[in-house]
Swiss-Prot record:
InterPro entries: BRCT_dom, BRCT_dom_sf, DisA/LigA_HHH, DNA_ligase, DNA_ligase_AS, DNA_ligase_CS, DNAligase_adenylation, DNAligase_N. One of its GO terms (cellular component) is cytosol. CDD domains: LIGANc (cd00114). The active site is at 148 (n6-amp-lysine intermediate). Its EC number is 6.5.1.2. Residues 746-768 have a biased composition (Low complexity). Belongs to the NAD-dependent DNA ligase family. LigA subfamily. This is DNA ligase. It comes from Paenarthrobacter aurescens (strain TC1). DNA ligase that catalyzes the formation of phosphodiester linkages between 5'-phosphoryl and 3'-hydroxyl groups in double-stranded DNA using NAD as a coenzyme and as the energy source for the reaction. It is essential for DNA replication and repair of damaged DNA. It is an enzyme of class 6 (ligase). Keywords: DNA damage, DNA repair, DNA replication, Ligase, Magnesium, Manganese, Metal-binding, NAD, Zinc.
Length: 768
């Protein structure tokens, strides 16, 4: 969720430009259209990463959906734009490197979203027409209709009734192993009840935090002086990604199961029948579902729950409609991303009225100045809202809102607060009279004159990137993020204490360059302003309190807190993070985890990247000209280089270890490793590929040179066989590493024969 403290609004320049593209079907895409398509795809990937990997969406659901649907429109007009790595061909998010990757026995798909009843009817009629073509081989359609829970999709693997693994959906094929955290959820049985369950079965469901429990948990956080969680969905996702299961156990998590993946010996003939079996086995099944015969019945179900969706146990963001019969589901099959037999209807956002008290601005990590509305708190979509982003001055103007207006407020996707516009009929009745918002001309944090980075930019920025306290605070917070150094003890409040404390006047950090050189003594006198609380409620009065040290008494002198000690331990550990994480931490525009991994693989060291030409970087697979320009511009700034040099002097690793004697046998090859190899861990296999000049990919495509298939190879093996990709076992992999592709022809054929008989549901948990 975007907040005034840490906003990341939609790049409306790109959005508006993309919306202005007019193309005719069959006309080859122009260069400008290709550029706009690539920008749109990059935005979708960026926002998807924030949602799935950082559990912190930076735009509303409605804004994301608008970008995504525009991407689909462009691909429909120009199918040649579609590639295997297009966001429209992928499911959900990537797999976080913070958890072990495990491969699902059967792929977990996403759902096709529809945003109006007309769209839902069109989908239903299309499904009915497809079923009609199947003739008498399938029964008449019955619609299993259920609530779309706003939580985190999870896959449970049971063997002989015992829970052996739990994983996130990830990219649909490979997820994160969160078994230890899932075991803390009391509704999930470690051993299935009764009898008749398959010897091996994957059970899919949604982990969520009940609405009432979420409010109570947030109240306890506030009472303890901690920041409340943004919303139940992000809270559930973040809870399952805690490194310590004891922390997860403190969160009020629940789960409802809603599907079955791979199974051996399941006797159910329909979705509804399988739900009855799941209940008999002791699994939690949602009580909010019905099997309906007609589309009119489905519409009544949608209307009924639309009226009372905020009175339910959990948050929902729509209704899922599925064809109930399994045989029909199998006959209709799947696209590359979604089943053809199910869709998710999303309710239009609920709207309420409230008063816009003020419009303030915040300065973000890149200097972007973002206005946000401060409103009289009002309950909307089940929670109280008093604040919403307005993105930029053009959005404020387009919405036509003025300070003092009664405004229409809604939650996009029932999650993200959004100001729709003013209630004009009430404008003249407001006291005091409404006034126009004027974007500041100087940075509210450092006083520097504001200006667009480029003449055509909609956003205005503070150019004082080096010294602006707000930008520094945001960059320090980013350094600690999961995708960068992953420093859990350096949260938002700690970043404020390091860069903008109430005391001393000169903060411990005036540049992130000193982060890894901090000492405990540097933090001894840091005080922050914290609101006094009475029975968990803010009093409006503030006091200065030490942040990094205990208060100290005559009997117990002030000393570093346990969290401070943890911070220094994690800073020391972070120095050994791989090069790609260091690159992410530097806040270089456009350079995220994917580009950083590609750069680290191609160049091996920070110095090599710093000294590379723009052309050399642009030719790296996964980088390209835009990122290459951004890198050269970043390294051309002296104080940026001071950060790199200071971190290096403090012991931060700036080079991935490589053995120069290792031959570059895999130069130009893309190799995918799947399943369990007896003598290689997943990371060891990837490293072996990279140091020999190859690209270690996580997905199989027509560009894959080889698939290395271990035990329990899973769906990647099936795809490789369909595409004719050579398959190697571990012996063939060793031969490839030693001698390159010229020596592996016969081994590849032999390995393919051997690998195809691997039973993908018979082995222990597969790892990528």
């Amino acid at each position: 969720m975007s907040t005034p403290e840490n906003p990341d609004p939609v790049d409306t320049t790109t959005q508006d430009a993309a919306a202005a593209i007019v193309a005719e079907e069959g006309t080859p895409p122009s260069e400008s259209l290709r550029d706009e398509y690539e920008q749109l795809a990059d935005l979708v990937r960026k926002y998807r990463y924030a949602y799935y990997q950082e559990d912190s969406p930076t735009v509303s659901d409605a804004e994301f959906d608008e970008l995504y649907r525009r991407l689909e429109e462009l691909e429909a007009l120009h199918p040649e734009l579609v590639s295997n790595d297009s966001p429209t061909q992928e499911v959900g998010g990537e797999v976080s490197s913070a958890f072990a990757a495990v491969e699902h026995l059967q792929r977990m798909y996403s759902l096709d979203d529809v945003f109006s009843l007309d769209e839902l009817e069109a989908w239903v009629r299309k499904a009915e027409a497809s079923v009609a073509k199947l003739g008498d081989s399938v029964p008449p359609i019955a619609w299993l209709t259920e609530l779309k829970i706003d939580g985190l999709a999870v896959n449970l693997l049971y063997r002989d009734g015992k829970l052996v693994r739990a994983a996130t959906r990830g990219d649909g094929t490979t997820g994160e192993d969160i078994t230890h955290n899932v075991l803390t959820i009391k509704e999930i049985p470690r051993q299935l009840s009764g009898s008749g369950y398959p010897s091996e079965v994957e059970i899919r469901g949604e982990v969520f935090i009940p609405s009432k429990a979420f409010l109570e948990f947030n109240e306890s956080l506030v009472a303890a002086g901690k920041a409340p969680l943004a919303n139940p969905r992000n809270a559930a996702a973040g809870s399952l990604r805690q490194k310590d299961p004891a922390e997860t156990a403190k969160r009020p998590l629940s789960m409802f199961v809603h599907g079955i993946g791979a199974r051996e010996g399941l006797d159910a003939k329909s979705q509804s029948e399988s739900y009855k079996l799941l209940e008999e086995w002791g699994l939690p099944v949602s009580p909010y579902l019905k099997v309906l015969e007609t589309f009119d019945d489905v519409l009544k179900f949608i209307a009924d729950y639309g009226e009372r969706r905020h009175k339910l146990v959990h948050e929902i963001d729509g209704i899922v409609v599925k064809i109930d019969d399994f045989a029909t589901q199998r006959a209709l099959g799947y696209t590359s991303r979604v089943p053809r037999w199910a869709a998710a209807y999303k309710y239009p956002p609920e709207e309420v009225h409230t008063k816009l008290l003020d419009i303030a601005v915040n300065v973000g990590r890149t200097g972007r100045v973002t206005p946000f509305g401060l409103m009289e708190p009002v309950k909307v979509a089940g929670s109280t809202v008093g604040m919403a982003t307005l993105h930029n001055q053009d959005v404020v103007k387009a919405k036509g809102v003025m300070i003092g207006d009664i405004v229409i407020l809604r939650k996009a996707g029932d999650v993200i607060p959004e100001i729709v516009g003013p209630v004009l009929a009430l404008r003249d009745k407001q006291e005091p009279p409404v006034r126009e918002f004027v974007m500041p001309t100087e940075c509210p944090s450092c006083g520097t004159p504001l200006a667009p980075a480029k003449e055509s930019d909609v956003d205005i920025r503070c150019p004082n990137a080096k010294s602006c306290p707000s930008q520094l605070r945001e960059r320090v917070f980013h350094v600690a993020s999961r995708g960068a150094f992953d420093i859990e003890a350096l949260g938002w409040e700690a970043a404020v204490a390091l860069t903008q404390p109430a005391e001393p006047e000169t903060p411990p950090l005036t540049s992130e360059a000193r982060l890894f050189s901090l000492t405990r003594e540097d933090l001894a006198d840091v005080l922050i302003r914290r609101e006094k609380r009475s029975k968990g409620v803010g009093t409006g009065e503030y006091e200065l309190v030490p942040y990094f040290y205990t208060k100290g008494t005559a009997k117990s002198p002030s000393k570093p807190t346990a969290t401070t000690e943890k911070l220094f331990a994690e800073l020391e550990k972070a120095k050994q993070q791989p090069l790609w994480r260091v690159l992410v931490a530097l806040s270089i525009r456009h350079v995220g985890p994917t580009a950083s991994r590609a750069l680290a693989t191609a160049f091996g060291s920070m110095d090599a990247i710093r000294n590379a030409t723009e052309e050399q970087m642009a030719h790296v697979d996964g980088v390209g000209p835009t990122i290459a320009v951004a890198l050269k511009e970043w390294f051309a700034v002296d104080w940026h280089n001071e950060i790199v040099d200071s971190w290096a002097a403090a012991g931060v690793r700036m080079e991935d270890e490589r053995d120069a004697s290792v031959p570059r046998t895999l130069e130009g090859l893309t190799v995918v490793v799947t399943g369990t190899l007896p003598n290689f861990s997943r990371d060891e296999a990837k490293e072996a590929i990279i140091i020999r000049g190859g690209k270690a990919s996580g997905s199989v495509s027509k560009n894959t040179s080889y698939l290395v298939a271990g035990e329990s190879a899973g769906t990647k093996l099936d795809k490789a066989e369909q595409l004719g990709v050579p398959v190697l076992d571990e012996d063939g992999f060793r031969e490839l590493l030693a001698n390159g592709p010229a020596q592996t022809g016969t081994e590849a054929e032999a390995a393919t024969d051997e690998a195809t008989v691997v039973d993908e549901t018979a082995a222990e948990a597969a790892t990528e």
